[in-house]
Amino acid sequence: MTEAMARHAATIRLAVLILLAFGGAATGMAEGRRVQIITSFPPSFFEPFRSAFRDRHPDIAVEVVQRKTTAAVIDIRTHKRPDADLFWASAPDAFELLKRAGLLAPSKPRPTGAPQTIAGYPVNDPGGRYLGFAVSGYGLVYNPSYLTARGLPVPHNWADLAAPVHAGHIGLTSPSRSGTTHLMVEALLQSLGWERGWALWSAIGGNLATITARSFGVTAGVARGRFGIGISIDFLTEANAAGKEGNRFVLPGETLFAPASIARLAGSPNPEEAELFIDFVLSPEGQRMLREPRIGRLAVSPSAYGPQETPPHLSEIEGIFNRTGFDAGLSAGRYELVNLIFDEWITFRRAEHARLWRSLQAMEAALLSRPDEEAARLLTRARAALTRPPVSAAELDDPARFRNLARVPRGLPVPEEQARIEARIRSAIAASAAEAGDSLRQAAERLAALGWRDESQTGARP
């Protein structure tokens, strides 16, 4: 070997050693302590917690994956996030769904001083799989300026949203895209009963101006005057109202008031780090952070409130859960069925659904000054068709029938049994819409003979 060749070989050996050294260092960094969180909360909520936790534990990297609650549940159930450690969200039925699937690890309650229940609802899962850290009120958000400019009344309960005066002035998110909306839909179904609850949701659906892509879009739309009323959660209202003259929040009598929770996922690759993050969220410091204006949440720990501070909303909702008796287990068992019915009945048919409801409302009003027995019978028939759920309460007596329903991504095959259920639901909805439309046409003819002119669609918002 010549001297030049020897020098070249030595250079190569040195380069290899340097690469190995730096590669090893890089690998060591990549394999350092970390915790990955799946959450439905916005960055304005989780970033302060991530920063404060890193101050306490600078050796632990905190990775956050933001997903809508429903999408997060799908990701976790289909193991698309095998490296995730924690699930952090508002909707208790989403946690119950994951618990039933065996996807949540046990986690011991922390000494927060929180009561066992708030308004009758357990703060922590009695089975020890998820822990409440904050409290959420679910209700109505409205823009006072929008309502005043149009002479619209402020809604105070869910039934107000079905009033004809609010047609075209309401926004919400589909429950299949938002755990917040799903919880509110389910709460009314449980409070009023399956068939009465769906009748009310159908009427509210007929008044919708839009269905937004995310929960945050509802409060943002109200704040910007795209529509005047929304269905939302209290902290999203506060987040959008910051620095604005605008949104107000109402807790209806049949509302839902529930803990937001955090849980460690089964098979978490970083269980120690995950438990440390839970420790922090439930620590006095973490609980006090919830009360900061930039976050604006209700803490479960009484020590987070000042001596003269009364947690807002608590006096308004005392005993609500005792009346409604919300059952997270029942909700979890029919989670996808409720989403499927809402989307097929209201989301995907919004324009036609609104048109039918506007016609019905206009003719019911006309009937007051033009009494006609046959027209009244036809309108009663139309209302019954518009408010009839495509799955009856009697069919729910066999809960196993719908338990295996799952949200299937576009382009993937739907299981045969689910395809049959979906087809039957679509067929029932289409038949009811056709029945309502036929009855409304006949009623319109009778009222027209009495001098009535249908102007219900004139200038209507789509």
Mark where each language-model region is.
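A bilobed periplasmic-binding-protein/Venus flytrap-type ligand-binding module shared by bacterial periplasmic
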Residues: 141-146, 257-273, 289-290
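Periplasmic-binding protein-like
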Residues: 136, 169-173, 200-205, 211, 243-270, 280-301
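A ligand-binding cleft/hinge motif common to bilobed small-molecule-binding domains
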Residues: 93-97, 223, 227-246
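Early extracytoplasmic/lumenal segment of secretory-pathway proteins
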Residues: 31-96
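C-terminal non-catalytic accessory extensions
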Residues: 363-462
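Paired acidic/hydrophobic, glycine-rich loop segments that form the ligand-binding mouth/hinge
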Residues: 84-89, 211, 226-233, 248-250
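Extracytoplasmic ligand-binding site segments that recognize negatively charged/polar headgroups
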Residues: 47, 83-84, 90-212, 216-223
